[in-house]
Structures are given as C-alpha cells and as structure tokens.
C-alpha cells in the first residue's frame, strides 16, 4: 500500500546503523508498506546514500532551516531539538496513516496489522504504564496536529525533556479513553523490562513482535564475535539478560547492512573485519567517529531519586543489580 508507511528517524551516523537494521528487519518480514526515514543534517552524505538503498524515502529535516514555527520553537526551547525533528513525522501528509518506530527497535515478525489501529495507538511505558512509550506508535499525519504539537512544545515544553513527555501531554486521554489504542506490550518489548519482570517474559516473550533496545547502551555499542555469532557483554548487565535479541540485531547487521556499508566505502575491508576473533579492534571503523561515552559526574541522592522516578535509573552503573544487592545486604546484616 503506497499511502501507508513505517517511519523512523536518525540524527547521526550511529543511529543510522540502527535505522538500517530496522529497515532490513521490516523487509525481511515482508512488509507491504513503504518505509521512510527522517534524517537530520548531522547524517553524512555517504550514510544518506546507504539509507536510500533500504528506505523508499529519505527526507532531510533541518529544523533550523525550516520555514514553519518549528524554527521559532527551537529558538525558544533549544533542548527540544531532536523532539522537534521527530514531530516532523506528522507533516508527512502524502501518507494517510503511519507507524513511527525508533531507530533502536528491531522487528521480529510481520507487523503490518498495526495499520488497522487508529491514532494514537501505542504500548504502555514500562516505567510508568499510564503513559505510552513513544518508541512505537500509530498515527495519522496532519498539518493541524503538527502545528498544535509545535505550539504545545513552545508553550509548555516536555515534562521529561523529550518527545515522549510532549506526546503524552498532547494525547492525554490515552490511558483511560479507548483501550483499543493500547498496543500489546509485544509490539514494543523493552529490553530492560525483560530483566525487571522475567517470569512474564518467560511466559509471553516468545510472542514478541518488536524489541526496543532502551537504555544508554545501544546494540551498535557492543562488540560482536562473528565466529560465535554472539555479543561480548557483561553477564551482569540487566539489558542483556536475554542476549538473543542483541545477537539477532548483529546478525541482521552483518548479513544485510555491513555489505552496504562496504559498498559505499564506509567500511573498507569487511572480510578482514569479519575474520577477526573479535570486532572490538574494528569497532571504531563501524562507529563512524563516535567518541566513547564520557564518565558521568557524581550526583546527589536527591538527583538520583529524581532520575529513578523519571525511569532513568543507571542500570549499567550505580544502579546495577550487583550494586543494589550489595546495598541491601549492608542493611540486612
């Protein structure tokens, strides 16, 4: 169907790798809808050419250069830059209905049935289920809605500093108005929630249709061993309690995306890259100049509490399972 589309967004070359894997997984599961990727000016020309081989439409979104009120909103609230870029998906009025998917999602089976849903359909957020998670949602492009969202962003901002807070404020009736707009969790399975509710995952995880790699560490940040076809990761990392999803992401990347990157000169020698015992030595070649994450400054207990309440616990560091267990043990002794 040419009037319906899956839409994603990439704001740099690193997330473009995620978008390419997402697009490849949609194709692998034989979607009949068009595929669109919105890109910011930070995406390189060479990477944009790779995106054009996977997606039907590659659309540059430069909020600073836009002629609409998005530019004025950005001047007023510069912290919402990426959010305003994502909101541009509502301006794609050449399509009657779309499904937006973040670039850190992976499709596990055909999900074209999502187009039977109405705006705004989304799955609950694992951190606060009365809010929906904006990583996967069904929507209807509309210039009127787009302008209203821009106005809301300008006047009120976002309670979480990102698109999810803004969209939950705009579609505030989602929690109680119409249960048919609540997508089953299997359409947006959070990799972190697997760890937090393992029994449910064991019972229902086999039905997962989309996995969402939430958290600071994305699939492309791990190292991968092509000989064992598995990621090299810390067994205590809560986001990899079930690394088969990470392995599946990397399998899709090495099979479908890596050859495209090589063809366009973004990876010089894929064969020697894959012959390495580990990819850690070549990871910089695939990170396109990504700098390693800077060490996080220490925060007060009050700041840490606020981050927990906002669903931003540092599962990879201070709030890891081992650290929490160690703290509890000191109180229980």
Swiss-Prot record:
The record marks 86 as: Important for catalytic activity. The modification N-acetylthreonine is found at residue 2. UDP-alpha-D-glucose binds at residues 9, 11-12, 15, 77, 86, 102-104, 133-134, 160, 163-164, 215, 218. Residues 284-316 are annotated as: Interaction with GYS1. Its main location: cytoplasm. It catalyses: L-tyrosyl-[glycogenin] + UDP-alpha-D-glucose = alpha-D-glucosyl-L-tyrosyl-[glycogenin] + UDP + H(+); [1,4-alpha-D-glucosyl](n)-L-tyrosyl-[glycogenin] + UDP-alpha-D-glucose = [1,4-alpha-D-glucosyl](n+1)-L-tyrosyl-[glycogenin] + UDP + H(+). Pathway: Glycan biosynthesis; glycogen biosynthesis. Its EC number is 2.4.1.186. Divalent metal ions. Required for self-glucosylation. Manganese is the most effective. Mn(2+) binds at residues 102, 104, 212. SUPFAM superfamilies: Nucleotide-diphospho-sugar transferases. Self-glycosylated by the transfer of glucose residues from UDP-glucose to itself, forming an alpha-1,4-glycan of around 10 residues attached to Tyr-195. It comes from the Eukaryota. Glycogenin participates in the glycogen biosynthetic process along with glycogen synthase and glycogen branching enzyme. It catalyzes the formation of a short alpha (1,4)-glucosyl chain covalently attached via a glucose 1-O-tyrosyl linkage to internal tyrosine residues and these chains act as primers for the elongation reaction catalyzed by glycogen synthase. Part of the GYS1-GYG1 complex, a heterooctamer composed of a tetramer of GYS1 and 2 dimers of GYG1, where each GYS1 protomer binds to one GYG1 subunit (via GYG1 C-terminus); the GYS1 tetramer may dissociate from GYG1 dimers to continue glycogen polymerization on its own. May also form a heterooctamer complex with GYS2. Belongs to the glycosyltransferase 8 family. Glycogenin subfamily. This is Glycogenin-1. It comes from Mus musculus (Mouse). The gene is Gyg1.
